Amino acid sequence: MNQSLLVTKRDGRTERINLDKIHRVLDWAAEGLNNVSVSQVELRSHIQFYDGIKTSDIHETIIKAAADLISRDAPDYQYLAARLAIFHLRKKAFGQFEPPALYHHVVKMVELGKYDNHLLEDYTEEEFKQMDSFIVHDRDMTFSYAAVKQLEGKYLVQNRVTGEIYESAQFLYILVAACLFSNYPRETRLDYVKRFYDAVSTFKISLPTPIMSGVRTPTRQFSSCVLIECGDSLDSINATSSAIVKYVSQRAGIGINAGRIRALGSPIRGGEAFHTGCIPFYKHFQTAVKSCSQGGVRGGAATLFYPMWHLEVESLLVLKNNRGVEGNRVRHMDYGVQINKLMYTRLLKGGDITLFSPSDVPGLYDAFFADQDEFERLYVKYEHDDSIRKQRVKAVELFSLMMQERASTGRIYIQNVDHCNTHSPFDPVVAPVRQSNLCLEIALPTKPLNDVNDENGEIALCTLSAFNLGAIKTLDELEELAILAVRALDALLDYQDYPIPAAKRGAMGRRTLGIGVINFAYWLAKNGKRYSDGSANNLTHKTFEAIQYYLLKASNELAKEQGACPWFNETTYAKGILPIDTYKKDLDAIVNELLHYDWQQLRESIKTHGLRNSTLSALMPSETSSQTSNATNGIEPPRGYVSIKASKDGILRQVVPDYEHLKDAYELLWEMPNNDGYLQLVGIMQKFIDQSISANTNYDPSRFPSGKVPMQQLLKDLLTAYKFGVKTLYYQNTRDGAEDAQDDLAPSIQDDGCESGACKI
């Protein structure tokens, strides 16, 4: 290597390259790691040095050289690259490796307008000194490379135009804790700040993108998911689109319920004009969703819901596919088709499904969610009423069209609206669940708005986080984590701003939370269980029982302290009904684990003191934040031992946790023979989870004769999911052979899923 090369320092001075210094930094970064070679990294980077190279470019070249060596055989390069990246990041943020004192850092950031000035109003310099003593900056060294790149790209406070970075990860964690507990009494709050900081900085609790990137800054909107219901009037349609724009601009993912909009050709003003139908209004919503790019943190994305029996359903099911012309396609949203038992019964009996415009059949649309018996009574009555416009379709043809579109696009989702209302924390008579969200894990009541400031409408918000099952040794640890997660997210509801009155009203009235899990695949591998063979059924029952029990207990304790949520009377919990009372009894045939906790005592305490939060759990996808915690995604099996994620910061390689010890224990996605085992596990989880689950179906065409997945198989899995009480189905993944080769040159590529990464964590 040429020792006479000149390098340009960060301050503009030039000097000769100091290879010893580079070697020392690499030695430091490699300390304690297995199977990594410093000289290999040096060789790969030296050939890219040139005369006049900036020291920052040298650093980036070395980081990239180390990251390129991450493989199944040498997973520790992900930590070598991460340490080098942390070193570089701190130099950029602080001009040196050692972070400054927390108080001085906060003062400077508030002056620059990067942090919310309430931090200095809420806490004294003395309290900041105490918080500084809680910080363990060495925890930065436990990040994987993919995690550091996620932090840099999405989470750390920065100037997205110039690329300047202003903080390091431990400051992010301590300040999120400080903001969330700022309204707690002085005598207890620092204790909560420390406990919460420890839980998030050791990856036991995983936080969603809006909280990680937003709490501590002047922007105060952190709900990942927003659910907006549209009425059947122009005013309501315009109010819906205004609400979409407001929330898309503030980092949220959108669920739109457009099922009430009348069908093409319906009379308007008593026949003075006829209606243009759903598609022009769906296009209007699509434009609203795509209007904001959210400052590089995420692009806008939405899932739009409609009932299977809508008169226009055959035109709506094909909106996402690549055939057709611009005029009859709306491709940049995803769609959720709403189904209930009557539709499935017609399919099984070889019957017809009758399609109506919701505007022609009084009471039918509301009964579809609120009362299944009443829905069936009205539906059959309207089928026999010759004065009502309708169309009959063979059930098998309609279901086949839906499943064909689901298979070809992967993004036609399913919502079983009867399960969403019969196994629900809400009383469907007063608070029916009429839609889900972008990623299908949220099930909350909504009401249409007539204008954007309508006080009587209700926009549902959900605030998410997750427990990292890979970071706990026993289920008992969930008790403390549940206390911290519930208290932090509940405090967030009061801390954040609400751009629309209907959203504030619902959030303050219901105080809904959605706490889920990440790293489930690692949890199974650690316990020697598999997805596909039933061996994980009892463990899953035990795990999710503990999660829901401790979450309810934490919310009940909080209610004793701060009062139940104002609309607690609209929940089934208020009547003493718990998820263990309303689950689908078909599950008893596939799991024989008994209940382990004192639900009876909890039931009495909830009836007496209430809950601070109407909902507590939801199982969301977690591609992004599971990278920060070096965990597997949500409840999903990994596609490969090494996954490659294409992000705007380049290609990121991530190796499954504890690969060297557990490589034979993991069950990879495409090793599963079918969806049965996975759908059983989702059903068992849904027994306890009070909202819903982003559950996927997966197909490998090469397993079937003629290399094509038979329609019969798709319908069988749909019915299996329904049988086990599954509320929603999210993606359908089809193996194309390219994405999951297991050699190190072609590890599995993970796409960003819902384009925005909202509603996931």
Residue ranges: model-predicted function:
Residues 318, 327, 331-409, 417:
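Polar, glycine-rich mid-to-C-terminal structural blocks
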Residues 1-3, 36-174, 178, 191-197:
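Core nucleic-acid recognition elements
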